[in-house]
Amino acid sequence: RHHLLRSGPISGPLWWGKARREEEVQRRRCAEIADFLDLADHGSMPVGALPYGVQKRIEMGRALAMEPRLLLLDEPVAGMNQEETEETAHHILQIRRELGIATLLVEHQMDLVMDLADRVMVLDFGQVVAIGEPAEIQRNERVHQVYLGGAS
């Protein structure tokens, strides 16, 4: 979040009080994000020493620190076990519901997509197969043909 600070290494000493207050505000915001994503207990550990699912949540936290209006998530649960997948799905829903941040999710685990998405776009080699609500997509015969080889 340092890019959000209005004082830098040169101007900081000239505006010491203001720079210090800004730093405190940014630190509090980062702590809020860590609490929101259940990361507060991991603050003193090197990221590389943490479990994979926690590392992915830290990545989401870094993105949230930028105060986005749209959060782009490219396969956020790839390589995760079931518990990590469920935790991540919970946090994605929290981000949407509690923070009001729109999310664009690219994911191949269709059960997760159906649980998280309001709208789904199905692509086949870059071509749009279907767009609609999860229930519509599940009933779409073309989607079944593309993804299940014609079985429905």
Which functions belong to the PLM regions below?
Residues R1-S152:
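Glycine-rich phosphate-binding loops of nucleotide-dependent enzymes
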